[in-house]
């Protein structure tokens, strides 16, 4: 019998990992296996395997329950807490004077637990969609329309799953509770537990004549489109939550949410690097410009700007262009662009150019042969003195 993998192991993090470390691991896996990015046949299946571990470990209550009770604690029905979180032992010893209190304890161990109202409205599942952005789109933002498949409320039956003109009926076996009593043999003897009704499968309702459109599910698969306004200054791996754009709910419950994952590609821009709101650019200049100084055009994402290079500038010298970086997501400010100077050494000199450099070296007392020779013997003298 196959055993479930440890959720921390699935995400590749330690049990003491912080929330940021868990999110970082999830983003890494999403970028690797998301079906929109990875075209391998089993990518979608691999992608699904770490959805529940992420949903569990990113929620403080669910994570605490998982750490204490393992996979049983991650079950939405464990202890009667329902999808909203962890609810403990389903009533504990509130009725310890009779069988009911002990029944609650046995149920939490042997698969029962008090079930939530099966007819209560329940929110639909969340969905995820990924958008690939160019370097410029991530910096300046983008408005786009995305289309995807989702379950919507059936237009024929209105979501109740029954043929028009008919209505679902209360389940004759569980009387609408969605669960039934059952005896189970345990190491402690025979005990009464509650389990999902095998007639209505936990819905508390029976549909005699099903809707021909949705076949009794109350949902139908449709292509849904929504406008997404990506703000300026987003970073790789960030998510946007679009409320009520996920799957349809049940029993009149609201739609789930759509989480849009943003993937920002630096490959579309080969001259800039970026870290948050800071943009980095390497400026090539020749040694004459470095020695004498110059005024040069520097490209930025906002257009070219003039930059004065002081005389005697050395390679790796940094300049900061205020307000020429990427917008910050919070507030109306903008980051800076950092410019790093890289002095380019000339290649393939002709004889006239070589002679000019030799003359320059003599005028400044920088004979290359003398420097190399003196430098070598000075090092040897220092070595023998030690």
Swiss-Prot record:
Binds 2 Zn(2+) ions per monomer. SUPFAM superfamilies: Chaperone J-domain, DnaJ/Hsp40 cysteine-rich domain, HSP40/DnaJ peptide-binding domain. Residues 363-386 are annotated as: Disordered. Zn(2+) 1 binds at residues 154, 157, 211, 214. This is Chaperone protein DnaJ. The J domain is necessary and sufficient to stimulate DnaK ATPase activity. Zinc center 1 plays an important role in the autonomous, DnaK-independent chaperone activity of DnaJ. Zinc center 2 is essential for interaction with DnaK and for DnaJ activity. It comes from Tetragenococcus halophilus (Pediococcus halophilus). Homodimer. Participates actively in the response to hyperosmotic and heat shock by preventing the aggregation of stress-denatured proteins and by disaggregating proteins, also in an autonomous, DnaK-independent fashion. Unfolded proteins bind initially to DnaJ; upon interaction with the DnaJ-bound protein, DnaK hydrolyzes its bound ATP, resulting in the formation of a stable complex. GrpE releases ADP from DnaK; ATP binding to DnaK triggers the release of the substrate protein, thus completing the reaction cycle. Belongs to the DnaJ family. The keyword Transcription does not apply. GO terms for molecular function: ATP binding; heat shock protein binding; unfolded protein binding; zinc ion binding.
């Amino acid at each position: 019998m196959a055993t479930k993998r440890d959720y921390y192991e699935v995400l590749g993090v330690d049990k003491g990992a912080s929330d940021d470390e868990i999110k970082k691991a999830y983003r890494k896996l999403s970028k690797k296996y998301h079906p929109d990015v990875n075209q391998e046949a089993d990518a979608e299946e691999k992608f699904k395997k770490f959805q529940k571990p992420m949903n569990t470990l990113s929620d403080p209550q669910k994570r605490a329950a998982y750490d204490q009770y393992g996979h049983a604690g991650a079950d939405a029905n464990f202890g009667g807490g329902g999808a909203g979180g962890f609810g403990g032992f389903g009533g504990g010893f509130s009725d310890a004077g009779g069988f009911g209190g002990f029944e609650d304890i046995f149920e939490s161990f042997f698969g029962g637990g008090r079930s939530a109202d099966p007819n209560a409205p329940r929110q639909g599942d969340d969905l995820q969609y990924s958008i690939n952005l160019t370097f410029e789109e991530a910096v300046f933002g983008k408005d786009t329309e995305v289309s995807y498949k989702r379950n919507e409320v059936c237009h024929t039956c209105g979501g109740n799953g029954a043929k028009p003109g008919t209505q679902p009926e209360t389940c004759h076996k569980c009387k609408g509770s969605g669960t039934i009593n059952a005896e189970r043999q345990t190491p402690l003897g025979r005990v009464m537990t509650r389990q999902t009704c095998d007639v209505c499968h936990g819905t508390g309702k029976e549909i005699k004549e099903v809707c021909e459109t949705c076949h009794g599910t109350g949902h139908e698969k449709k292509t849904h489109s929504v406008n997404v306004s990506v703000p300026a200054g987003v970073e790789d791996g960030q998510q946007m939550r679009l409320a009520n754009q996920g799957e349809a709910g049940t029993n009149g419950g609201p739609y789930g949410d759509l989480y849009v994952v943003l993937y920002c590609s630096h490959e579309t821009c080969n001259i800039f690097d970026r870290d948050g709101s800071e943009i980095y650019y390497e400026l090539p200049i020749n040694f004459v410009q470095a020695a004498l100084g110059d005024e040069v055009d520097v490209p930025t994402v906002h257009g070219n700007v003039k930059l004065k290079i002081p005389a005697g500038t050395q390679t790796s010298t940094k300049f900061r262009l205020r307000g020429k970086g990427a917008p910050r997501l919070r507030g109306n400010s903008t980051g800076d662009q950092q410019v790093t100077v890289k002095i380019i050494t000339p290649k393939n000199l002709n004889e006239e150019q070589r002679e000019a450099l030799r003359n320059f070296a003599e005028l400044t007392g920088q004979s290359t042969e003398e420097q190399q020779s003196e430098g070598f013997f000075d090092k040897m003298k220092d070595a023998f003195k030690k």
